[in-house]
Amino acid sequence: MTTSGTRAAHRPSRRQWVIEAATELFATQPPDEVTVADIAARAEMTSAAVYYHFSSKDQVLVEGMRVFAAALREQVESLTEAHRPGSDIGPVVTGLVVWLSEHRSAATVFFVSSAGMSQEAEALRHEIRTQLLDELVRLVGKGREPVSEAEAAVIGLGVLALLETAAVSQVRGDDVYRSLGHRSFLHEVGRLAERIADPAAE
């Protein structure tokens, strides 16, 4: 602590505190209404300390998205690696939705709040979407054998669209999510994932 009661700027952990504080704010307010002063207050730092790590609030937003995206990608890779060949992919997709619910603020920022905020944010979203698609195609290949590369790519796109839609529905708590409740929502997401992956199984 400094004598003013705020946190010092230079410690490595302070950068993560800034990201976490900003993520909480961006998840509950329109990002264009959040100021560096707001972020500093939430992080119990001065604005100067925030600027020590980031040049602008937009940079904080993108870095928070990058941290979340890396964790999401790692989760997808881990679940895909552990997936038993030939088994349904529904549990993997619902597992991802559960993970997103456990990281609600960051998921809200990534899938909802940051949309259209900047070219850098959109470029990052596109980059991560491509990486997730590659991993989901690999998952489809493990879940359905044999499957052609083209078919796996199409199915992977469908699963990615489902995952993104489920993520938005969940973080917004929209009518569909509220009417089903969390448990039934997960069940339906898993069932839809399996139908997308193997329509003939219905």
Residue ranges with predicted function:
Residues 1-13, 20, 24, 140, ...:
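N-terminal intrinsically disordered/low-complexity leader segments
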Residues 1-2, 98, 102, 134-142, ...:
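C-terminal peripheral helix-coil segments that are non-catalytic and often amphipathic
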Residues 13-17, 21-59, 63:
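Helix-turn-helix
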Residues 14, 57, 64, 68, ...:
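Hydrophobic/aromatic residues within well-ordered alpha-helical segments
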Residues 17-25, 71, 91, 95:
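Pre-recognition alpha-helix immediately N-terminal to the DNA-recognition helix
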Residues 63, 77-105, 146-147, 155-159, ...:
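Hydrophobic alpha-helical connector segments
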Residues 70-73, 119-144, 153-157, 180-191:
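Amphipathic alpha-helical packing segments from all-alpha helical-bundle domains
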Residues 98-134, 168, 172:
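Short secondary-structure transition hinges
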